[in-house]
Amino acid sequence: KLSGGQKQCLCIARALTVEPKVLLLDEPCSALDVKASAKIEELLKNLKERYTIVIVTHNLAQAKRIADDVAFFQNGRLVETKDAETFWEKPECEETKEFLKG
């Protein structure tokens, strides 16, 4: 029987078999334990060298560890997009600032 993390890795591997240009992942580490989540994050860090990866997540800590660029959406509207460092350090839009405050 496969663990949640193993199932998630298998799903990602299966998606890669068709050699996509973009890999879209929706909450790839949700419902996984810390160890499995760390393995998925490491896999994604390695894959982003070869693929364009779009991750939809509410997990800001995870986004900080993985993302090169960030697009912030609120109520279905694109609010702000920046390289990750600038996004976390100097957001411009008030909605982004409020969201990042928690």
Go through each PLM region and give its residues.
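Helix N-cap at the start of a conserved alpha-helix in ABC-type nucleotide-binding domains
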Residues: 34-36
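Conserved ABC ATPase signature
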Residues: 1-2, 6
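Catalytic Walker B motif of ABC-type/P-loop ATPase nucleotide-binding domains
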Residues: 23-26
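A short, surface-exposed alpha-helical micro-motif characterized by mixed small hydrophobic
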Residues: 63-65
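Conserved H-loop
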Residues: 51-56
